[in-house]
Amino acid sequence: MKMNREILRIAVPNIISNITVPIMGIVGTMIAGHLNGNSSATIGALAIGVSIFNFIYWNCSFIRMGTSGITAQAYGAGDVKTTTLMLARAVAVSLVVGLAMIVFQYPIGSAALKVMNGNDMVADYFFARIWAVPAGVLLFGLNGWLTGMQNAVIPMIVAVAVNVIHIAFSFWFAFDFGMGITGIAYASVVAQWTGVVITALIVRIHYRKRFVAITMSEVTDMRAMKEFFVINRDIIVRTLCIVATYTFFTAASARMGNDVILAVNTILLQLFTLFSYMNDGFAYAAEALTGRFIGARDPRSLRDCIRKCMIWCVIVAVLYVGIYIGWWRDLLELFIDSEVTDAHEIIDYAGRFIGWIIAIPLAAAMPFVMDGIMVGATQSRIMRDSMLLSTAAYFAIFFTMRPLIGNNALWMAFSLYMFLRGVLQYFLSARLGKIYSQAE
């Protein structure tokens, strides 16, 4: 029971934090679906714009994961100096990456719009939201450090605040100011920068007595920075694979032939996102606790933690399967204004693929917790190799099956991709033997 409390202490705040993210996406999709009489075109434009920023943010997620794993192990070992240095390094790297995105926004935007077949609506969205990127990357670094410090409450408070602000400003800008989906982008800028300010203030107040004096030369120590980037090199490769699969999913949907398929796949993917962000709460718990118990050299607690995190992820998966079986049509109707001309066509067409959404939670239960374990153990090579193999399978299945089953091939490829991620990490880690040995 004590371990379950430890898991829930970290998982529940992260679930609350994470569940606000798909809610924000759902609200954005709902706003797009109510902006004019052509829901499919507007939802599709927003989906492409969001996919571009998912590509950018996911490519920066190595900052969060690398910071979290190293910090958690230092926390478990009682190494206050390293935890302080990791915060400084996370902020420094985040600032450099975020500012680079601003400097190179035009070539990045032009390339992204060309690859994704983005129209003028997507372009307006991109060049508005790009100013939120430095803040978003900073939040990655800060939240990674807080996760490593076993603190899920501060990220929860900030996430709720950011998403409430984003939703409120989205309605205000999109409808009252008539800015359309560009208003949703500007709402993100306001919300993300507010989140950075809130996080910085809370961290300063809460941890001011737990920091030790450090120098700039220690922060920029080449040996330590090299270690940080070597760990994150593999995470970057893994992240690129994730970005490629999700971005390709939207791009392939857009190239299927009509706006209805793109709208349907966008909405169904939002339902999967509802599941993924909740299960990710237990992945964060596995991440923080795995690092902590490895740092503390406590193999017994490590085994108990991993086993119970896996059980919790399966429970969540079964819960979502039940929800999707019973209320899938009601959930879909939240996204579309029933007054628009193509609403019933979108919902009826989505029904053809709902079986995949019901099955995916079971296929995806294991990879989430395995990701958390590998991040906490800083086993980045295992994460990289499993992701490369899973991604190769994803594309092979899609291109092989598409001529035979059309859009079903995309969902089949995605389902098997998720399943393989978990299975491969389990076996590449010698059935977790490599993880347990780190705590001995």
Annotated model-derived regions:
Residues 43-103, 139-155, 264-323, 364-378, ...:
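Small-residue-rich hydrophobic transmembrane alpha-helices
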Residues 68, 109, 161, 230, ...:
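ATP/adenylate-binding site constellation spanning eukaryotic-like Ser/Thr protein kinases
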Residues 23-26, 34, 40, 74-77, ...:
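Helix-loop interface residues and adjacent transmembrane-helix termini in multi-pass membrane transporters
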Residues 15-65, 69, 132-136, 226-292, ...:
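Transmembrane helix-bundle signature of multi-pass secondary active exporters and lipid flippases
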Residues 61, 129-148, 155-163, 184-199, ...:
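Short runs within selected transmembrane alpha-helices of multi-pass transporters and secretion channels
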Residues 1-14, 71-134, 174-233, 290-359, ...:
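Short alpha-helical transmembrane segments in multi-pass integral membrane proteins
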Residues 26-30, 141-145, 164-172, 200, ...:
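Alpha-helical transmembrane segments of multipass membrane proteins
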